[in-house]
């Protein structure tokens, strides 16, 4: 057992010595008798006393080194933001109180039951009623020509489901526009059949009050179209509403240009959820007037409108089928068995609770894939036409899980000119479809031109649309996806963000999964907070370890253990992955110290001595080192040995030589960069990248992956996961290019002239810093596609590689986040601080 207790042995903080007394640095004469007596009086053993004295001597030497006459460069960074007192004070109740865990376990069981019901074909019970669609169905007259409703049960549902405030619709929807639309549709349905009911008056009163409030709200174009047309119908029925109100007059004025712009004309195969509100001449028809019934066989409201106009028997059969399923109401969409499954998987993954449902996710995606075809999918297996939303979400989810899906499926959503197009006044359905198209496009493989076209189109569309729609959870979700995409986010950060804007689209005219959505969100919040308690415990241990090791006394280096632990816990969110989180944090902490020694603090002679000590791998090697390096060397030595023991317990294989080789490689590469700095040499771009792939540290950061409970096959050489593998080559190169672009000016300020920017400009005389940035961005874009292929392609031979690449990719993504705006390791008091606060310090409100 090493002196710092193994991460896989809980958080026992006892300190033991792995080396003999003769190997402990001797007590220097500059240790006072008072200090010696004070240490001995605490009852420590001789070995513990000697170690503490070594730390005291190291501290004194570190202070003396500042005035030792050696010219030393200093890094440009701010002090540690999180002192030990603050860390030790962190506390929550969620891990301690069993009631939270018990509630979470019940919710896990309930969500599993939802998955199971859906897989058995009984998922309709989780689809919520749509007051809006039910109102349209209630208006359909009997097909036999009698003066009665064809679907009287829909009238009964309206009469039985008015809210106390006079409105109709889901009470969970806070959007006023949503409630107004539902209520007016239901009032019109009742009035159409001349039903004498106080409920009509109560509904009209709610609308009148709502119109007054509407003046202070920003409303979407979708509402303007739908509500204005409903107002026309209400006026024809002589319903008492404030038609002269300025707000309603404004809606009417806006309606005509919106319709004149051809809302439905230019969009290929898009959602038709608002078609029922268009004027008759805007119905989806061919030039000869033939109507496309298949376009609206997933929308009860559209089917009802067409049935009223045409008596189409397919629409009648469709509505009969839906009401047979749900009784006296209809949902906003049906059938949705494919989209429902994709929605389930997408939500549990984005909320960070997917680890509980791995089996269910596999079964669910196998079902979706069985209906996948070259043109994509619709909402349901019986959909006659694919839609962009279901296809985009399906493509993204299936590719992420390793299914063989071709990007060519997106070609079917272009217009005749081969372009993705949109309407001038889009609906929520269209925006959601384009958002999922953008998310899918970020998983492009090399050579997939349609994915590049989709990304360009969707990004431009979303950037414009987010400026137009009202602030809402949906708009914040769009902003998040645009800002972080796929390569610059990590699971816990995404979960924390998605908890904030998870829910029903705030102004969509229908909802389908209200009950399941509430369960998902409650479970996600509980899981987030329970894990938050474990984070505090682990971080408190790590803070004590850092202090006990003497590393906290090093003034020349960045102290970023809280930030590194935050990254680790954003990547590995399972409680059982403690060894990974702790090992990752320790390794990154010592790697940063060594990086700062080689980048700024050490002399070339000292750096060579440290390299030789690492190659010897013997505690006695510290005698040749400067005082400030001794403690660093011993922490490195013991940590690497400790983690090799952890890995051997997990994998049953000795990985010490592999870990030592990884450290020797990074220190050799650090020395090369130090010599470049000392001599003022600027290498070629290729030479720089080749060396910096190693100094990026990815092959060090991934070592804790070996502690995960993923068996390493006996026949798999360790070199398969080494820095020479293609996956790590790509990730390291992208990481270095991304980091250099944001750290270039800071590095230049403290003497590091070698970076991808300066090397490119040297190789290409006459080019500017902007040219170098453009070249780096183009290179990153290409390499990201290669990296996607490595992660999600069909060629991975060994299950360990497929499984281990995901956390390795998440480490790369975490690094991308840290360098997204600036060097987030050096300047950690801005975006990095926000990451720490939101994913580690603060719990979420239940």
From Swiss-Prot:
BP GO annotations: diterpenoid biosynthetic process
Localization annotation: Plastid, Chloroplast
PANTHER family attached to this UniProt entry: (E,E)-GERANYLLINALOOL SYNTHASE, ENT-COPALYL DIPHOSPHATE SYNTHASE, CHLOROPLASTIC
Transit peptide: 1-58
Gene encoding the protein: TPS8
GO MF terms, alphabetically ordered: magnesium ion binding; terpene synthase activity
One GO location term (cellular component): chloroplast
Enzyme Commission designation: 4.2.3.180
Annotated Mg(2+) 1 binding sites: 595, 599
Keywords: Chloroplast, Lyase, Magnesium, Metal-binding, Plastid, Transit peptide
Tissue expression notes: Expressed in young and mature roots. Expressed at low levels in barks.
Similarity remark: Belongs to the terpene synthase family.
This protein's name: Pseudolaratriene synthase, chloroplastic
Outcome after substituting residue 558 to A: Abolishes catalytic activity
Catalytic activity: (2E,6E,10E)-geranylgeranyl diphosphate = pseudolaratriene + diphosphate
Swiss-Prot/TrEMBL cofactor(s): Mg(2+)
Alphabetical list of SUPFAM superfamilies matching this protein: Terpenoid cyclases/Protein prenyltransferases, Terpenoid synthases
Biological function: Converts geranylgeranyl diphosphate to an new 5,7-fused bicyclic diterpene, named pseudolaratriene. Catalyzes the first committed step in pseudolaric acid B (PAB) biosynthesis. PAB exhibits antiproliferative activity by inhibiting microtubule polymerization, and has demonstrated antitumor properties against several cancer types.
Effect of residue 564 to W: Almost abolishes catalytic activity
Effect of residue 591 to Q: Abolishes catalytic activity
Result of altering residue 670 to A/W/Y: Slightly reduces catalytic activity
Keyword Plastid among UniProt keywords: yes
Chain span(s) of sequence motif DDXXD motif: 595-599
Record bears the keyword Manganese: no
Pfam family, one: Terpene_synth_C
CDD domains per UniProt: Terpene_cyclase_plant_C1
Effect of residue 564 to I/T/V: Abolishes catalytic activity
